[in-house]
Amino acid sequence: ALARKATIYAEVLGGNTNSGGQRGEGTMTAPNSVAVQKCIRAALENAAIKPSEIDVINGHLTATSKDSLEILNWTKALGLSGTSFPYINSLKSMVGHCLTASGSVESVATVLQIKDGFIFPNLNCEDLHPEIADLVDSSKIPIKLIHKDIKVAIKASFGFGDVNACVIFKKFKI
């Protein structure tokens, strides 16, 4: 890309994929928490970054009853909560669930946040689920656009079939 003088939107630092095997609480449509947390931790290890370096998470978050479980899994995997937790959002609040295209579409949105220095809001997030409010400060779940320099962002998909993926992007600097 440098040799071609192409625009570099972000650097892929690392990532991980795994499956919960539809065991324990994992089902065809619900993730296995142990596998989700392992996926997040392995992605961080693969990218050689610490949880405190994450500026924003573009979560799987589908506005369902499992959102609080996803947030709980993030807090456990990262060891962060309250105001130390990174910002978290979900593109699904703007475009709906793109099904098999979700990971790709949401990765583009994540990279654009890095490139253009903003955190997109969680639209229609009027009443924060009490279980989420107990884990993460409400300021970390933006309901309005935030202009902010983003250095590191994670995109997560904890999808159908109990299959998990996390990819970590970083702002590219020459």
Which residues are covered by each model-predicted region?
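Stable alpha-helical structural segments in soluble proteins, enriched in small hydrophobic residues
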Residues: C39-A47, N73, A77, T110-Q113
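Conserved beta-strand-centric core segments of catalytic alpha/beta enzyme folds
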Residues: A1, T100-I174
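Acyl-CoA/ACP chain-elongation machinery
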Residues: G15-P31, G59-S68, S84-V136
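Active-site-proximal gating segment of KS-fold condensing enzymes and close homologs
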Residues: K66-S81
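Short acidic capping loops at alpha-helix termini that bridge into adjacent secondary structure
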Residues: K50-E53, T83-F85
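Conserved small-residue
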Residues: V12, I54, N58-H60, S107, ...
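Condensing-enzyme catalytic core mediating Claisen C-C bond formation in acyl metabolism
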Residues: A1-A47, D55-V56, I174
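Conserved active-site and cofactor/substrate-binding residues in soluble primary-metabolism enzymes
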Residues: T7, P31-C39, I49-S52, S65, ...
